Regions:
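Conserved HGGG/HGGXW glycine-rich cap/lid loop of the alpha/beta-hydrolase fold
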Residues: 10-57
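Conserved serine/cysteine hydrolase catalytic core
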Residues: 183-230
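Conserved alpha/beta-hydrolase catalytic His-Asp/Glu region
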Residues: 146-203
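Catalytic histidine neighborhood in serine/cysteine hydrolases
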Residues: 230-245
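Gly/Ala-rich beta-loop-alpha elbow adjacent to hydrolase catalytic centers
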Residues: 90, 94, 98
Length: 265
């Protein structure tokens, strides 16, 4: 059964529809650095996952926090938007969800940027503990974020594990990103559920798949791209040069081109 929930989203541009899904604790505005480049050739729908960003604080009663539930909720959103088989793309957890949606036949293509779901047990523990530490720090710093991120050094210290070049984030983007992480009500439950799960059945994917990994990803290590290649026969593997886990801030041109190439018929 597909559960429906109203998600916050932005829709702009013209062309084939491309749905953008952010990662855990993130928000739809994380795609802003690549948006102008994309919407010249695609109708772009950037959404907030349930319980994150501006989407409803509480998902429907009885909804679990796992990847399967999030996939079902986003699938319901696609129905509400009249998007039968759009191109799909996502970062981190959003990349994993894009692949799951594509397995269900909900997409014409899937592009995953440093997707979650391809870690071994040790790597998954490292990522979980890292993110738990990140969110605790974010909750402590959130009341002072406006003043704090006027300093480039503060941006480096706060986002260095997620972005290869944190000073390319503006103070306003840094503040908003930290607040989105600190205030996300479904973060802890979603993180624990995702850490215990893995991507499976990649051979069921019958649409074009691109896996792009930041070569300087310090959260989900770049070597996981090799595991993704083994699990998804025929996937196009791209290494994003000089990019971290959230590559949109590091090199918008490079990332936009990967998204455009991955969403061509």
């Amino acid at each position: 059964m597909v559960v429906r929930v109203q998600l916050s989203y932005d829709r702009s541009g013209r062309g084939e529809p491309l749905v953008l899904i952010p990662g855990i604790g993130s928000r739809r505005q994380v795609w802003a650095p690549v948006l102008d480049r994309l919407k010249a050739q695609r109708e772009v729908v950037a959404l907030d996952l349930p319980g994150f960003g501006d989407s409803p604080i509480q998902p429907p009663p009885g909804t679990a926090a796992g990847v399967g539930s999030l996939t079902s909720l986003v699938s319901g959103f696609l129905d509400e938007m009249g998007l039968e088989r759009p191109h799909l793309a996502g970062n981190s957890l959003g990349g994993w969800i894009s692949l799951e949606l594509a397995k269900l036949g909900r997409g014409r293509s899937a592009t995953a940027l440093s997707p979650a779901g391809f870690s071994n047990r040790r790597e998954a523990t490292y990522a979980r503990v890292s993110l738990q530490l990140c969110v605790r720090i974010a909750r402590l710093l959130e009341p002072r974020a406006d003043r704090l991120f006027a300093s480039p050094l503060a941006r480096v210290l706060a986002f260095g594990q997620l972005v290869a070049h944190p000073t390319r984030m503006s103070p306003a983007d840094s503040t908003a990103s930290l607040r989105a992480l600190a205030l996300a009500p479904w973060f802890d439950e979603t993180l624990m559920a995702a850490a215990l799960d893995r991507f499976r059945d990649g051979e069921q994917l019958s649409v074009p798949v691109t896996i792009a990994w930041g070569e300087k990803d310090r959260l989900l290590l770049p070597r996981q791209a090799r595991h993704a290649a083994r699990l998804i026969p025929g996937a196009r593997i791209v290494i994003l040069r000089s990019c971290g886990h959230v590559p949109m801030y590091d090199d918008p041109d490079q990332v936009a081109q990967v998204l455009l190439d991955g969403s061509r018929d």
